[in-house]
Amino acid sequence: MLILISPAKTLDYQSPLTTTRYTLPELLDNSQHLIHEARKLTPPQISTLMRISDKLAGINAARFHDWQPDFTPENARQAILAFKGDVYTGLQAETFSEDDFDFAQQHLRMLSGLYGVLRPLDLMQPYRLEMGIRLENARGKDLYQFWGDIITNKLNEALAAQGDNVVINLASDEYFKSVKPKKLNAEIIKPVFLDEKNGKFKIISFYAKKARGLMSRFIIENRLTKPEQLTGFNSEGYFFDEASSSNGELVFKRYEQR
């Protein structure tokens, strides 16, 4: 199984590292093209394009300027330990064993606007470039056109390497849109997480994001290899609802805490 998750806007380059092992991103030539385009933007243009504050725009303009392709442990950090959003709160990769990192390196991929596809131990320099941003480039009007089939092809390589044809889509719609399902050599399973609020079950963004991380951790810790094993997921009160599920969608629910 190949697990797909989104990156995070929040980054952590300060906490102690729990592994010293690392690999290098496989699509850095493409990243360099995007950095070249991003460096043309002024901080006010970045602010408008990304809908972020002037302060954040200044930080990200500096990141684009400082980015350089020779990644080392001194100027970069393993992606799975650098991202710190809601998904990664659930994943808690900082508590992984070396065996967990081994399994994750084979079975987990992070989709990225700048790096395309990241393996957990791939070094990553800090950036902010969300997949949905309309950054014009030599290949088209946005990042979806820039990446084209590249991300899908890289995922197919990972599937072939593990002799498997199942993708667990735990990425957001914004990021999964960078994948071409018809060209992906895989059955796609999408777990959906619903929380009860006022007697009704619905997707609550913060909880759903954290649950995607919890599910990723569940798969990694238990070394799961078959989609049917996912139905045993019960972290933090979630349970599998077979009646609401279908072949491609596994629905998990959690009752409101009273």
Swiss-Prot record:
Domain of life: Bacteria
GO biological process: response to hydroperoxide
Protein name, entry field: UPF0246 protein YaaA
Gene: yaaA
Species this protein is from: Shigella sonnei (strain Ss046)
One GO cellular component, as annotated: cytosol
Family to which this protein belongs: Belongs to the UPF0246 family.
InterPro entries in the cross-refs: YaaA
